[in-house]
Curated annotation (Swiss-Prot):
Bound cofactor: record note: Binds 2 magnesium ions per subunit.
Marked site: Substrate discrimination: 27
Organism: Lactiplantibacillus plantarum (strain ATCC BAA-793 / NCIMB 8826 / WCFS1)
Keyword annotations: Cytoplasm, DNA damage, DNA repair, DNA replication, DNA-binding, DNA-directed DNA polymerase, Magnesium, Metal-binding, Mutator protein, Nucleotidyltransferase, Transferase
Protein's name according to its UniProt entry: DNA polymerase IV
Signal peptide start-end: none
Binding locations of Mg(2+): 22, 120
E.C. code: 2.7.7.7
């Protein structure tokens, strides 16, 4: 007689008060503040593709440009195609960093438990706070008011008992919204979310989810833990808990990032050096954008490759100076390392490539390195 598997109940800690603060179109809003005429024009924060030979990626866009379908991480040339009247503004990262620091000083007036995610977003644990404000909603409103008063910028906030739900909530009423998800409301909130909203479910996982009939949180909830782990491994284990409202990750206010990198897996496997170089170029762009967003640079570049037969090679190159955050440079070094390490296992194809920077330090005027090429300005 077959025995049914009884799954243990998931522990859910609802004692915390977590706020996810997400600045609204941060870089574009700063430029609108500095240049009020931009407020009524489609504004794209990126190098103008008409001046770069079509190169470049959109950092962000204002809400006017978004109505044309322009969004972050889009090729700048595609943004121009969608919106020929767009104003392209080269990112001014020193200014954005300065404003971000100003906003973080406001956060510190309320709590020391702050986990920065990027220039424009952070988690705050306000379970106990310096102002002794019992209501997290009241505290979120005060944060919004103080940020507006000091910077003339708006932010949206999500409030809940864990980081996962708070981040989902912050996206609900943009711009300038406040959304709270109470413990008793978490389950219906999560069940109606599209599966794409669950962290870890990316472009490659979505089709597999859809093939299994998983399109919403409710569909995900209906899956057994065993089935999710069989299909998705560690991600399945995590998703089983997330859709049940469980996320015990702390707000890492002492966290210091030790590396920044990106990996891609391939199916079918890569079979030629040309394919490898094409994907290294794309990965290098993502890493450069992430390094710039986190305002870090590093001294060591690491290339990771995994062959079709699962043999994995990791090779690093360390430099005496910080490497400029330049995608072309990351690509060049990664290609050089690849040529050094590639061997007969290449006959089985390549299933994974990754580029990582380590030996990180904050970008600062005293250790900035000038671009190698004049066109990089």
């Amino acid at each position: 007689m077959a025995q049914s598997i009884v799954e243990a109940p998931i522990r859910v800690d609802t004692s915390r008060k977590i706020i996810h603060v997400d600045m609204d179109a941060f870089y574009a809003s700063i430029e609108e503040r500095e240049h009020p005429a931009y407020k009524t024009q489609p504004l794209v924060i990126a190098h103008d593709p008409r001046q770069t030979g079509g190169r470049g990626v959109v950092t962000t866009a204002n809400y006017v440009a978004r109505q044309f379908g322009v969004h972050s991480a889009m090729p700048a040339a595609k943004a121009l195609e969608l919106c020929p009247t767009a104003v392209f503004k080269t990112p001014n990262f020193p200014l954005y960093r300065e404003v971000s620091a100003q906003i973080h000083r406001i956060f510190h007036e309320y709590t020391e438990m702050i986990e920065p995610i990027a220039f424009d977003e952070a988690y705050l644990d306000v379970t106990t706070n310096k102002k002794h404000i019992h209501s997290a909603v009241e505290l979120a409103h005060r944060l919004q008011q103080e940020i507006w008063h000091q910077t003339h910028l708006t932010c949206s906030t999500g409030i809940s008992y864990n980081k996962f739900i708070a981040k989902l909530a912050s996206d609900y009423r943009k711009p300038a919204g406040v959304t709270i998800v109470l413990p008793q409301d978490a389950e219906p909130f999560l069940l109606r979310e599209p599966i794409e909203k669950f962290r870890g479910v990316g472009k490659k996982t979505v089709p597999k989810m859809h093939d299994l009939g998983i399109k919403t949180g409710q569909d995900l909830y209906a899956q057994s833990e065993l089935d999710l782990i069989k299909q998705f491994g560690k991600l399945g284990y995590i998703l089983y808990r997330r859709v049940r409202g469980s996320d015990d990750r702390p707000v890492e206010y002492l966290r210091e990032r030790k590396s920044i990198g990106k990996e891609r897996t391939f199916g079918p496997f890569l079979q030629s050096t040309t394919e490898v170089n094409t994907h290294l170029k794309a990965i290098a762009k993502l890493v450069a954008a992430s390094m710039q967003s986190h305002q870090r640079h590093g001294k060591t570049l690491v290339l990771k490759l995994r062959y079709g037969d699962f043999v994995t090679i990791t090779k690093r190159r360390t430099f005496g100076e910080f490497i400029p955050n330049d995608a072309a440079l990351f690509e060049q070094y990664a290609e050089e390392i690849f040529e050094e390490v590639v061997d007969d296992h290449f006959n089985s194809g390549i299933r994974l490539l990754g580029i990582t920077l380590t030996g990180l330090a904050p970008l600062a005027f005293e250790n900035l390195t000038l671009p190698l090429y004049p066109n990089d300005n």
